[in-house]
Amino acid sequence: MRYVLCVKQPAYGKQGGFLAYQLAKALLEKGHQITQVFFFQEGVTHGNAFLYPASDEFNLQHAWQRLAQDYHVPLHLCVAAAQRRGVVEPLTSSTTQQNNLASCFVLAGLGEFMKASLEADRVVCL
C-alpha cells in the first residue's frame, strides 16, 4: 500500500513525532511505500538543522534522514509553517545567506501534500 504521513508534533517535547517515525519504519520494513512525509504546524521543527539533542537522547532528525536515504522517502516541510518558526533556506529567507534547513528535508506547499494524499491508499496524521 502507498502511505502519506503527516506529522504535526514537534521533534522534542511530545511523543507524536517519534511515534510517526516508528510507524514509518514499520511500514517500510513490511514492504509498504511511503510517498511523502509532510511536516506541518509544530512538526516543521524536525527539519531545523540547529536541533542539538543531548548525547544520550535519540536523535529523531538523524533517524528521519536515514529513513529518507535508505528508503527514498521524501521529507517535506510546510513552507508557511517553517517560515513562521524560523526554518528557512536561501530561497525563502530574507537574505540568500540564511539556511537552517536540515539535509534530506525540502520545503513544500500544501498543494504537494494534497496531491500526494489523493494518490495514496492511506493518509495517517500524527
From Swiss-Prot:
Q: Does the keyword Transferase apply?
A: yes
Q: Which InterPro entries match?
A: DsrEFH-like, Sulphur_relay_DsrE/F-like, Sulphur_relay_TusD/DsrE
Q: Name one GO biological process term.
A: tRNA wobble position uridine thiolation
Q: Which segments cross the bilayer? A: none
Detail the disulphide connectivity of this chain as listed in its UniProt entry: none
Top EC class of this enzyme: transferase
Task: Note the Gene3D superfamilies from the entry.
Answer: DsrEFH-like
Where is this gene product found?
Answer: Cytoplasm
* E.C. number(s) listed in UniProt: 2.8.1.-
Gene Ontology cellular-component annotations = sulfurtransferase complex
Could you name the domain of life of the organism this protein comes from? Bacteria
Residue positions of the active site: C78
- Asked whether the UniProt record includes Ribosomal protein among its keywords, one would answer no
Q: What is its main location?
A: cytoplasm
Q: Which GO terms describe its molecular function?
A: sulfur carrier activity; sulfurtransferase activity
Keywords of the record, alphabetical order, are:
Cytoplasm, Transferase
Similarity comment: family membership: Belongs to the DsrE/TusD family.
Q: Tell me, what does this protein do in biology? A: Could be part of a sulfur-relay system.
Designated name of the protein: Sulfurtransferase TusD homolog
State the organism of origin.
Pasteurella multocida (strain Pm70)
Q: Which gene encodes it?
A: tusD
